């Protein structure tokens, strides 16, 4: 399976998870559903980050045009980690503490995911990664999933 196809499938899976999580939220939240996206938008992995951004944007645009999730639009908040673990940690902290997201799609670099998942877990934030392949991520958190 090509890397680009994995990103596309990963984006679809995260959107499905957003729908599931949002459907089970109590009490009802008003306003957009904020979803963080950490990707290498610059640096050595920028081409993958750009593809991931385009795929996620198209998927969310389609969902929002069809009424969003339970009538709420999805709003994406992007952070560039440049495939650098320290920048992944900073990005995760910003998404949690400033943007107040409860779901993060971390698209590529295993080292960044390994560094940032513990922060997300401590804060009750779900993380999905479409490319993290490190064996160190197996059973790392009940709030972490990867695929396909």
Model-derived features: where do they sit?
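Extracytoplasmic "Venus flytrap"
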Residues: 36-55, 79-86, 108
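Short beta-strand elements in bilobed, periplasmic/extracellular small-molecule ligand-binding domains
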Residues: 69-82, 140-144
């Amino acid at each position: 399976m090509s890397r680009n196809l994995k990103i596309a499938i990963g984006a679809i899976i995260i959107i499905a998870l957003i729908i599931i999580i949002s459907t089970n939220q109590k009490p009802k939240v008003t306003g957009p559903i904020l979803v963080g996206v950490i990707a290498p938008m610059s640096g050595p992995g920028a081409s993958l980050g750009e593809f991931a951004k385009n795929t996620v944007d198209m998927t969310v645009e389609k969902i929002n045009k069809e009424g969003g999730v339970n009538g709420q639009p999805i709003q994406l908040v992007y952070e560039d980690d440049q495939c650098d673990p320290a920048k992944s940690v900073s990005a995760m902290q910003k998404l949690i503490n400033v943007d107040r997201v409860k779901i993060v799609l971390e698209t590529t670099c295993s080292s960044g995911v390994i560094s940032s998942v513990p922060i997300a877990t401590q804060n009750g934030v779900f993380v999905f990664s479409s490319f993290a392949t490190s064996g160190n991520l197996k059973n790392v958190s009940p709030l972490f999933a990867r695929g396909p």
